[in-house]
Amino acid sequence: MNYLNETIDSLNDKLKSGAVSADQLAKDTIANIKKTDEKINAFITVDEDAKPAEDLDFNNKLAGVPIAIKDNIITNGLKTTAASHILYNFEPVYESTVVAKLKAAQATIIGKTNMDEFAMGSSTETSYFGDTKNPWNLNKVPGGSSGGSAAAVASGEVVAALGSDTGGSIRQPASFNGIFGIKPTYGRVSRWGLIAFASSLDQIGVMSKRVKDSAEVLNVIAGADDRDATVSEKEVPDYTSFLDKDVKGLRVAVPKEYMSDAVEEGVRKAVEAQIELLRANGAIINEVSLPHTKYVVPTYYIIASSEASANLERYDGIRYGYRAEAKNLDEVFLKSRSEGFGDEVKRRIMLGSFALSAGAYDKFFLQAAKVRTLICQDFDKIFEDNDVIVGPVSTETAFDLNSEISDQIKMYNNDILTISANMAGIPAASVPAGLSETTGMPVGFQIMAKRFDEGHVFQVADFIERSNKFYEQTPAGLED
Ligand SMILES: NC(=O)C[C@H](N)C(=O)O
């Protein structure tokens, strides 16, 4: 079964009418993943025994629908590695809240997708389990860190997948693969069972080819959870109620810093075309400024690495995961961590430990925390007179495999347009804007809104999807 021309609604119809059984759907999905993954390596683990829930109730839109999960989200009894050697054999004995909610809605969990190790990266090239390839061009990266989820959706292996986004990890791969991806408001979706990278920034979200599919999955996974005190008790609206609307009178802010010369021409043109589309349909376009944009990359990498250095202390070779051969206890810690973590993870642990150390704390961590407040204030100010902020997701389209991974500064700078939404905790999405005239690869259009205003994000994304119909295009890299 390939999902390129399916939606959750079309699958629900087929299952309801008996045109296909949920058992058969799971089997066909696994067979297709195995075939497609020979080319793209989107999955770390496929659950060969995946079975639909019993007594399916097709009033649940997700009943019997196979869904893929990023491999940093805990799945009870199904290997969860965060794409790291240090967790290469880790089989959790509990369930993450999002997966428990998907199972309660009777979705079939089909497997775990590839990613950058512990979500640290923007190309899925830091995975211990090999690179994922971009279905639009197999010589290009799928982006990251949720590159496996994005490639799985873009190639039609699944209709929807969960990802996580700390500094752009859902939106950037969604943009590189020509699909939709949404990072909800910080506190909208429980992080219980998400393997922590930077706890004040991490958020679980959804990736799918079509906007409505993500709205339907978010309906299921959002909402309060006793196990995560950072999740809001706010009622979860029906996100599909924001679809099929026009954009007349909508106040749309375009930050001038997001349309600078640093943005590749093909990306800028595709993004400008969507802005013109909104204008032509009655939206009010306002040029605005996010003056602290030039500080977001260093601020993010100090905060995220500091939190990571503390969160990753738990991997000690004793309790779970990889344990190196050693002569004494000190050596167990030292060798397990040295051999278990990859270079990028070690780099961030060292950077973060330094930023938190006695002599450096005030100058780095504290300073970064203060700048973060200024970044948040930039957004609050714009949202006083605007409903959404739009612009590109990334300064470029998917780049060649092995072309940027050894240049950390370049890799980090690539995140400049996505990181701020995490620092401000606001919802943000990427919706396809077409193919770049210069590279022929997909371009993503970013939409951000106030905290807990996913509604406006869905409204604009759905409007753009209906207008440019990018979903009619199929990824060229998979043709034989
Ligand atoms: N995790 C993310 O959201 C991706 C970001 N590029 C990082 O490496 O931190």
From Swiss-Prot:
Catalytic activity entry: L-glutamyl-tRNA(Gln) + L-glutamine + ATP + H2O = L-glutaminyl-tRNA(Gln) + L-glutamate + ADP + phosphate + H(+)
A GO term, aspect molecular function: ATP binding
Positions of transmembrane segments: none
Keyword Nucleotidyltransferase set for record: no
Swiss-Prot/TrEMBL keywords: ATP-binding, Ligase, Nucleotide-binding, Protein biosynthesis
Annotated catalytic residues: 70 (charge relay system), 145 (charge relay system), 169 (acyl-ester intermediate)
EC number: 6.3.5.7
Subunit structure as annotated in this protein's UniProt entry: Heterotrimer of A, B and C subunits.
Database matches in PANTHER family: GLUTAMYL-TRNA(GLN) AMIDOTRANSFERASE SUBUNIT A, TRANSAMIDASE
Protein name, as recorded: Glutamyl-tRNA(Gln) amidotransferase subunit A
Organism: Lactobacillus delbrueckii subsp. bulgaricus (strain ATCC BAA-365 / Lb-18)
Underlying gene: gatA
